[in-house]
């Protein structure tokens, strides 16, 4: 029986099994981004004012800079993937980190970036998710993959901030897979 299943695997492509692997529909991606936004908010809520400016070592970003880096990338990837213009006030957040030194200002800037991506996904034309675009004038990928790369990026950098919280004696939020 197992041999029969294994023998038929080459006859089935991943696209046949799950077409969303190559061209995800915006709806499931919206749910993931809403969950990621809520999870990131938990990290921001866990941080104290001291944590926002904290750098575990002098040569890496502070907690606040990590969060602003996420926000900048959310805007850049979201804009490239959707064609939606980045709001004028949203460019170069990380370079303007001093303006976001308070928990309230930082949280608003980061949450606004998630709202931008979520809105871009909700407004996305499903038929265009498979279109090829160029990110950073360098990487060619589909619109759907650009949204996926943005998701991967924000997950990576949010995960990096776990150690910032732990080094300040704060228990980070529990994993939020669902």
Which residue ranges define each predicted feature?
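Solvent-exposed, charged/polar functional surfaces in cytosolic regulatory/catalytic domains
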Residues: 39-42, 46, 112-120, 160
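Bacterial Sec-dependent signal peptides at the C-terminal "C-region" and cleavage site
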Residues: 3-21
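Short, contiguous alpha-helical
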Residues: 30-34, 41, 51-94, 134-178
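Acidic/histidine-rich, surface-exposed loop or edge segments in extracytoplasmic proteins
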Residues: 16-24, 84-99
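Short N-terminal segments immediately surrounding and downstream of signal-peptide cleavage
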Residues: 16-38
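Short, solvent-exposed, charged loop/turn and helix-capping segments
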Residues: 47-50, 122-124
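Acidic/histidine-rich alpha-helical segments that form the ligand environment
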Residues: 32, 98-134, 142-153
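Feature for soluble, non-membrane regions of globular proteins
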Residues: 17, 119-123, 175-178
């Amino acid at each position: 029986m197992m041999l029969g299943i294994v023998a038929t695997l080459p006859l089935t492509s991943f696209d046949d099994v799950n077409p969303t692997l190559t061209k995800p529909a915006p709806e499931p991606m919206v749910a993931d981004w809403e969950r990621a936004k809520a999870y990131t908010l938990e990290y921001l809520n866990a941080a104290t004012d001291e944590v926002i400016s904290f750098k575990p070592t002098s040569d890496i970003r502070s907690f606040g800079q990590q969060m602003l880096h996420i926000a900048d990338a959310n805007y850049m990837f979201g804009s490239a993937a959707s064609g939606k213009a980045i709001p004028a006030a949203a460019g170069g957040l990380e370079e303007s980190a001093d303006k976001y030194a308070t928990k309230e200002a930082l949280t608003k800037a980061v949450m606004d970036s998630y709202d931008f991506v979520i809105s871009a996904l909700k407004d996305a034309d499903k038929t265009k998710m498979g279109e090829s675009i160029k990110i950073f004038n360098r990487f060619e990928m589909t619109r759907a993959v650009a949204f996926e790369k943005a998701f991967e990026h924000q997950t990576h950098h949010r995960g990096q901030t776990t150690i910032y919280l732990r080094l300040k004696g704060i228990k980070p939020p529990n994993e939020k897979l669902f």
